């Protein structure tokens, strides 16, 4: 028994490779999605079996027991193809198979646009969740296979919510088929449109600032009258939290958003949730987010812990202000992730005491660090060393 896993691209016969065409014409049985089977020419066998899941396909192959069976897939067999689910089952049954390529939707769209695609970030949103904001923040165009709940309009809605409404996007519908349509517009305009089920989305790279190490100058932020965590302290916070590019992070009591911005720059493929209830502070966070293009920074208006309930589980949490609810905030974070890394800043001894009590009550390994930073300031013809207020960083689960 020989099984061929053949990729058909858009399904149009004249775009198939000669090898795929030959296997289809020689096949005794062809299996696959109904749409692909319907597109096959009359010269191909009439023994066509509609099946989509790997288990359905394997059962049909075993039942038919024919010498030459062909399983057809849309797009390319190596590009988010269902073939990858069937191959392990065939190998387990010791059934010989051949994998044949086809045109992927990324190749089709690139050719129609007259653009190279080797630098595109390729993302599947076909029946699975994805983060379009993180995707467009990688410094290159992001191509999305869409389907199910995540159609182009839904993906663009997420971009708009992140402040990327003006980002140029292109939607390709029914590529290489009679109903083909290509539309270029902004993400905001895309939200109001409806597209065919067979659609793909190409989003251009989001504007991003030059990359640099943590510790942005204090003068770079819009500050207003809201207290701001200083440069060297922010650097220490990021070191304590050991932020990775894909992390989900909370900044509770975000203030101006200076820590939120630093976290978002470090977690460029992740997500940062800045929790703050003061209107003036929320406005400053918005301004700083736009200034630094940290589109993966999401504002959560409200008080903690109430505002934390709907947030995804964090990898690390910074608590810069608790509003007297330290114990409840720590508990909320631990309920989402028992191994979450915690860093709490404090200038008052009472806050240190509350943080230690909350962590010790739960048996969390704890470290207290005091930072006392002094900087030179000119006074007449002299440079005097002036001390900033000492600050404590109380950390939990940060020893590994």
Predicted regions and their residues:
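Class I S-adenosyl-L-methionine
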Residues: 1-98, 103, 107, 269-272, ...
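S-adenosylmethionine
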Residues: 277, 282, 298-375
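A contiguous loop/helix-start segment that scaffolds small-molecule binding in enzyme catalytic cores
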Residues: 1-7, 18-21, 51-52, 66-69, ...
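Class I SAM-dependent methyltransferase SAM-binding "motif I" and its flanking Rossmann-like core
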Residues: 12, 75-139, 305-306, 362-386, ...
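Active-site capping/gating segments
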Residues: 176, 183-198, 351-353, 359-400
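Conserved class I S-adenosyl-L-methionine
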Residues: 246-255
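Conserved S-adenosyl-L-methionine
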Residues: 265-272, 336-338
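Conserved SAM-binding loop of SAM-dependent methyltransferases across substrates and taxa
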Residues: 256-268
């Amino acid at each position: 028994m020989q099984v061929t896993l053949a990729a058909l691209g858009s399904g149009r016969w004249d775009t198939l490779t000669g090898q795929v065409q030959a296997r289809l014409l020689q096949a005794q049985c062809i299996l696959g999605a109904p749409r692909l089977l319907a597109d096959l020419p009359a010269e191909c066998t009439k023994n066509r079996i509609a099946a989509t899941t790997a288990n359905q396909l394997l059962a049909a192959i075993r039942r038919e027991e024919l010498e030459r069976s062909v399983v057809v897939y849309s797009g390319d067999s190596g590009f988010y193809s269902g073939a990858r689910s069937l191959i392990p089952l065939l190998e387990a049954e010791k059934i010989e198979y051949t994998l044949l390529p086809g045109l992927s939707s990324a190749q089709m769209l690139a050719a129609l646009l007259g653009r190279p695609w080797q630098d595109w970030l390729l993302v599947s949103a076909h029946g699975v969740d994805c983060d379009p904001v993180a995707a467009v923040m990688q410094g290159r165009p992001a191509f999305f296979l869409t389907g199910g709940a995540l159609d182009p309009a839904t993906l663009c809605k997420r971009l708009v919510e992140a402040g990327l409404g003006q980002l140029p996007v292109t939607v390709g519908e029914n590529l290489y088929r009679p109903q083909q349509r290509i539309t270029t517009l902004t993400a905001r305009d895309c939200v109001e449109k409806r597209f065919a089920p067979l659609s793909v989305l190409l989003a251009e790279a989001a504007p991003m600032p030059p990359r640099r190490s943590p510790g942005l100058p204090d003068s770079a932020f819009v500050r207003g009258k809201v207290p701001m965590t200083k440069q060297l302290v922010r650097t220490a916070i990021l070191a304590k939290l050991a932020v990775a590019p894909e992390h989900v992070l909370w900044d509770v009591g975000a203030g101006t958003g200076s820590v939120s911005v630093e976290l978002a720059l470090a977690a460029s493929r992740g997500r940062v949730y800045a929790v703050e209830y003061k209107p003036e502070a929320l406005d400053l966070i918005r301004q700083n987010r736009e200034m630094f293009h940290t589109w993966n920074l999401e504002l959560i208006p409200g008080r903690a812990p109430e505002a934390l309930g709907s947030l995804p589980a964090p990898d690390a949490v910074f608590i810069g202000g608790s509003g007297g609810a330290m114990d409840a905030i720590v508990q909320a974070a631990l309920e989402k992730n028992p191994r979450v890394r915690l860093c709490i800043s404090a200038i008052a001894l009472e806050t240190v005491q509350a943080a230690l009590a909350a962590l010790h009550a739960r048996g969390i390994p704890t470290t207290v660090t005091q930072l006392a930073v002094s900087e030179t300031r000119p006074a007449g013809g002299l440079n005097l060393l002036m001390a900033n207020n000492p600050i404590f960083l109380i950390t939990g689960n940060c020893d590994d």
